[in-house]
């Protein structure tokens, strides 16, 4: 759904999105209150970073646990995976600029120029490399790639074994 930032904030703060939140996180009152505030805070952080962007989409990408075949997917193997109730959320605004700006809570902003999708060695091991790689692969496949601004926050901790990078991949393909 596309709403303006003020509409999203009101919808979450007032509880109008509780039916959607309960599908993702369960319907315990304390959990819903925590998630409402989490989304409101993320929208506020986005609008502070990108005040010129008003029309927003919101995405959730779950972490996952690999029940069998852990890490074999990297070599085109099979994995039995299950989503967990921890996720990464992204507040996103699309635009025609040829740049992706992604700011994750507690990390520096990544900026990827979509007019240059070649490998940048300085980005190795950083989120920008994942973003650039996904955009490059889409371009190779003939998919039109355009810019967006995004703010993300995650309850999937880096290094937790719950595929925090995979959650970032899912958010980056929005």
Range-by-range predicted roles:
Residues 3-5, 75:
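ATP-dependent small-molecule kinase catalytic core of the GHMP/sugar-kinase superfamily
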Residues 65, 71, 79, 161-163, ...:
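Gly/Ser/Thr-rich beta-alpha loop segments that engage phosphate groups in nucleotides
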Residues 76-83:
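Short Gly/aromatic-enriched secondary-structure transition segments
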Residues 1-2, 67:
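Short, small-residue-biased leader/transition segments that mark boundaries at the very start
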């Amino acid at each position: 759904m596309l709403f303006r930032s003020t509409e999203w904030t009101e919808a979450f703060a007032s509880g109008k999105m509780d039916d959607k939140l309960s599908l993702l996180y369960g319907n315990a009152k304390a959990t819903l209150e925590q998630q409402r505030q989490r989304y409101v805070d993320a929208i506020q952080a986005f609008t502070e970073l990108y005040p010129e962007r008003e029309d927003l989409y919101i995405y959730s990408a779950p972490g996952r646990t690999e029940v069998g075949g852990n890490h074999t997917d990297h070599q085109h193997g099979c994995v039995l995976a299950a989503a967990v109730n921890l996720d990464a959320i992204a507040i996103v605004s699309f635009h025609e600029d040829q740049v992706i700006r992604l700011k994750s809570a507690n990390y520096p902003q990544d900026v990827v120029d979509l007019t240059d999708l070649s490998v940048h060695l300085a980005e190795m091991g950083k989120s920008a490399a994942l973003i650039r790689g996904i955009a490059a692969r889409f371009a190779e496949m003939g998919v039109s790639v355009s810019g967006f601004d995004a703010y993300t926050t995650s309850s999937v901790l880096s290094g937790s074994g719950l595929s925090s990078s995979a959650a970032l991949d899912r958010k980056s393909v929005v």
